């Protein structure tokens, strides 16, 4: 009887300890820079949407499109491609990209804009609607939001970007 109680007490202690370990490994709240949209003002994307693709290489990513036709991918490479608002079209072309690659040597670098000489292709990815956010934590915790007035913003750890007609920026 005493052994049974001792075993039950050990199991209970191990369960509580395991629970604390899980909680302590949860991602910390991402620090948002000034003028970054308030993530709490957006609602989670509907659970019935599938922000994935069936091809094998895409299993570690989430994909979505915005109402204004920007195509985004979240994962070890996070990027959005399209007619990005707030960028000079003569400098970046009709299909610009904002991205960050999460390779070992670039982990501490901010996102960047890249020009493209090609037109953007169509996408069938599920839409992320105005007022919605999508958080993807498979590789690196990334949250993207879509707001009114062609606003798209993503944050991944201490880096991210804001796309908006009044001026897009990266950090």
Which residues make up each language-model segment?
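A cross-kingdom feature marking solvent-exposed beta-strand/loop segments within repeated
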Residues: 48-59, 64, 135-138
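Secretory targeting and sorting signals
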Residues: 1-31
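Acidic, glycine-rich flexible loop segments
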Residues: 115-152
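Extracellularly exposed regions in secreted/surface proteins, prominently low-complexity, repeat-rich
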Residues: 140-171
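Generic recognition of long tandem-repeat/solenoid scaffolds
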Residues: 62-65, 80, 134-136, 153-156
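A low-complexity, Ser/Thr/Gly/Pro-enriched, surface-exposed linker/loop concept
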Residues: 32-54, 76-130, 161-171
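Short, surface-exposed binding/anchoring microloops in extracellular/periplasmic proteins
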Residues: 59-86
